[in-house]
């Protein structure tokens, strides 16, 4: 029975094994689950063949297959373990040891074959799984690398974009800071310009206030002056005309006393009255100079011929003394020396006042001419103009002082002359002075009344 089974198994094994082996695929693309399914099916075929039986020669033929040799060689531990298990399982079913030995060997070979084939299929499945897994892992790794590369490229692009954005932001911030700095500088310059304009305006207001106060001061002086009203020049002209009429009366009285050979006390009284009347005209001129010094200096209140011989608003004391020396002869040597000394001192004082007037005129001209030009209508032009006018006004104030000093020199010269001369000589000197100015006035009248044909 056993031999038949073995023969039948041998035939089936001989005829069936190649077809079974050829049907096994080399590689399974289905993955791990398909390999497990094939392995379980092959295990079922192995159990069926165990029930059918195989010959030892078939096992030898199977072992000569290079496929199974490689599998057995590669997995000796698995075959040994399975064969041992089958030997232990099948050994009690045999009745005698010699008979059981071939069967055990046959079963061992069959079990080795089945285990080898199963193991080989399992190895194929594992290799397929490994191959598919490697492909999957490789594809996954490649996909991951690509993704990593894409991510890195995206990150690098993001970083580059961030760098570009950062550069743009930094550049924009720098531009904003520069614009803010320029804005602050413009604001500072504008504030400084406003401050300068405010200072110039304040200076201009001060100049205007000072000029206004000076104008009010001059106006108050003109209003408070004796014999001089609001119209200073006209009032002075009228006052001088009245003085001239009174002076003529005093001169006529003096002439009558001299011609009548009045006593010295009587004649001295008349001479003192005429001298006091001269003092009155100096006082009127001083008040008029406070109102309008140019009118007094110009001599518009005198005739044209008198103006030709004017010196700082009146006559020259030295020239007047020179005329009187020839009119007062005979004079003693002491009187001549006194008059000569008086003439020299008067001449020196006249020269000093004349030099002072020239220096004043030159300084006034330089003040008006040395102003730095400025744009028309600008605040600097107005301030410069007002500054020049203020300085000129201050210098013009000294003209009144020159006129007052010249009148004092004339008044003192007359007084010194009266001290040198006797009463009758002083009376004759006053009459000679009046005659001189009367002839100048008459010359002016004749000049103005000359025929018009002579003007051509």
Swiss-Prot record:
Listed SUPFAM superfamilies: Leucine zipper domain (SSF57959)
State the residue spans of region: Disordered.
1-41, 115-170
The record, for InterPro entries, names: bZIP, bZIP_sf, TGA_domain
Q: Which UniProt keywords apply?
A: Activator, Coiled coil, DNA-binding, Nucleus, Transcription, Transcription regulation
Cell compartment(s), UniProt:
Nucleus
Cellular compartments per GO CC = nucleus
What processes does the entry annotate via GO biological process terms? DNA-templated transcription
Organism domain of life: Eukaryota
Biased composition (Basic and acidic residues) is annotated at 158-169
Keyword Oxidoreductase in the entry? The reply is: no
Q: Which GO terms describe its molecular function?
A: DNA-binding transcription factor activity; sequence-specific DNA binding
**Assembly notes:** Can form heterodimer with TGA2.2.
What the protein does comes down to: Transcriptional activator that binds specifically to the DNA sequence 5'-TGACG-3'. Recognizes ocs elements like the as-1 motif of the cauliflower mosaic virus 35S promoter. Binding to the as-1-like cis elements mediate auxin- and salicylic acid-inducible transcription.
* Protein name (database record): TGACG-sequence-specific DNA-binding protein TGA-2.1
Q: Source species, please?
A: Nicotiana tabacum (Common tobacco)
């Amino acid at each position: 029975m056993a031999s038949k089974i073995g023969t039948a198994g041998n035939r089936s094994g001989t005829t069936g094994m190649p077809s079974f082996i050829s049907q096994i695929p080399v590689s399974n693309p289905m993955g791990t689950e398909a390999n497990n399914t094939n392995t379980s099916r092959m295990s079922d075929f192995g159990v069926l063949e165990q029930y059918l039986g195989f010959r030892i020669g078939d096992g030898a033929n199977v072992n000569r297959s290079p496929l199974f040799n490689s599998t057995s060689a590669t997995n000796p531990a698995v075959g040994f373990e399975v064969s041992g298990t089958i030997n232990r399982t099948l050994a009690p079913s045999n009745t005698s040891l010699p008979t059981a030995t071939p069967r055990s060997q046959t079963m061992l070979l069959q079990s080795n074959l089945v285990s080898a084939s199963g193991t080989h299929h399992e190895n194929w499945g594992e290799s397929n799984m490994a191959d598919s897994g490697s492909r999957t892992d490789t594809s996954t790794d490649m996909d991951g690398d690509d993704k990593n590369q894409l991510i890195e490229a995206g990150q690098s692009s993001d970083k580059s974009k961030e760098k570009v954005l950062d550069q743009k932001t930094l550049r924009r911030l720098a531009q904003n800071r520069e614009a803010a700095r320029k804005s602050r500088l413009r604001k500072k310059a504008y504030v400084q310009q406003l401050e300068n304009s405010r200072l110039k305006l304040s200076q201009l207001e001060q100049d205007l206030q000072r000029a206004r106060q000076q104008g009010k001061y001059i106006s108050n002086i003109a209003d408070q002056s004796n014999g001089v009203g609001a119209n200073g020049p006209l009032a002075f002209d009228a006052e001088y005309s009245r003085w001239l009429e009174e002076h003529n009366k005093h001169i006529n009285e003096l002439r009558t006393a001299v011609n009548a050979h009045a006593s010295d006390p009587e004649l001295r009284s008349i001479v003192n009255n005429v001298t006091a009347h001269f003092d009155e005209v100096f006082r009127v001129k001083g008040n008029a100079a406070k109102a309008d010094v140019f009118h007094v200096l110009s001599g518009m209140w005198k005739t044209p011929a008198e103006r030709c011989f004017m010196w700082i608003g009146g006559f020259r004391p030295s020239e007047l003394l020179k005329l009187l020396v020839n009119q007062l002869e005979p004079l003693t040597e002491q009187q001549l020396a006194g008059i000569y000394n008086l003439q020299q001192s008067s001449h020196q004082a006249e020269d000093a006042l004349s030099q002072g007037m020239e220096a004043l005129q030159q300084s006034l001209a330089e003040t008006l001419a040395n102003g730095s030009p400025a744009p028309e209508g600008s605040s600097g032009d107005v301030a410069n103009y007002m500054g020049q006018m203020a300085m000129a006004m201050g210098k013009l104030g000294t003209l009144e002082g020159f006129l007052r000093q010249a009148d004092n020199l004339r008044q003192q010269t007359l007084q010194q002359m009266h001290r040198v001369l006797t009463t009758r000589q002083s009376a004759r000197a006053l009459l000679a002075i009046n005659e001189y100015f009367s002839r100048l006035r008459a010359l002016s009248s004749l000049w103005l009344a000359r025929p018009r044909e002579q003007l051509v």
